[in-house]
């Protein structure tokens, strides 16, 4: 068995385990009355407020907005795969947890389909060691686990970017905290902040 075949086989096994684990999470945690009491109707974020603050990713979808760049833009072959975009109803901590667990399953389904449809031939593209980008500017968006990432790049024709600005998901998502914490109980602080799943490296711009 070649390395590629073994990698595909092991990846399929791993994805099946992810799907199985997500199902266990739903049964053991999602149905737990204590967990539901601590997360339902806690840290509610409406769709209107989420969109006004530029929130994206699972947090936006948990508020009932079916927004995903993989289906809205024309990058990578996502249109060739069969998968769902999980959305919430109440925009609370429970929905944000629930959407993420369901997205684990959908991501695993995409990986399994990608392996089954992988064309034959070399896996690595032949690219030059040094890429000289033409003079100009561009902005590219991509869907990431925590939300939308944006890259604004200016090239002066040299070997590196003249200017690079990165818009991170966490930077926008964490900006909603003052709204979500208004009137909240102190014990709810950890649940609300945890449900945003932000990374400080993303927030520090």
Model-predicted regions and their roles:
Residues 4-205:
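Active-site bordering "gate/hinge" segments
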């Amino acid at each position: 068995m070649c390395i590629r075949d073994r990698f595909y086989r092991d990846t399929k096994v791993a994805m099946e385990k992810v799907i199985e684990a997500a199902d266990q999470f739903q049964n053991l945690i999602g149905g737990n009355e204590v967990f539901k009491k601590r997360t339902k109707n806690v840290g509610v974020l409406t769709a209107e407020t989420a969109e006004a603050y530029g929130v994206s990713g699972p947090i936006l979808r948990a508020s009932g907005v079916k927004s995903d760049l993989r289906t809205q833009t024309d990058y990578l072959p996502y249109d060739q795969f069969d998968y769902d975009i999980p959305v919430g109803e109440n925009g609370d901590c429970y929905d944000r947890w629930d959407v993420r667990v369901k997205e684990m399953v959908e991501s695993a389904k995409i990986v399994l389909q990608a392996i089954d449809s992988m064309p034959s031939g070399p896996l690595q593209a032949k690219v030059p060691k040094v890429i000289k980008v033409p003079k100009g500017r561009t902005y590219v968006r991509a869907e990431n686990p925590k939300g939308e990432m944006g890259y604004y790049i200016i090239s002066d024709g040299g070997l590196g970017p003249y200017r690079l600005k990165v818009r991170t998901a966490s930077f926008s998502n964490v900006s909603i905290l003052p709204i979500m914490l208004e009137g909240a109980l102190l014990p709810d602080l950890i649940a609300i902040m945890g449900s945003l799943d932000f990374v400080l490296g993303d927030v520090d711009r």
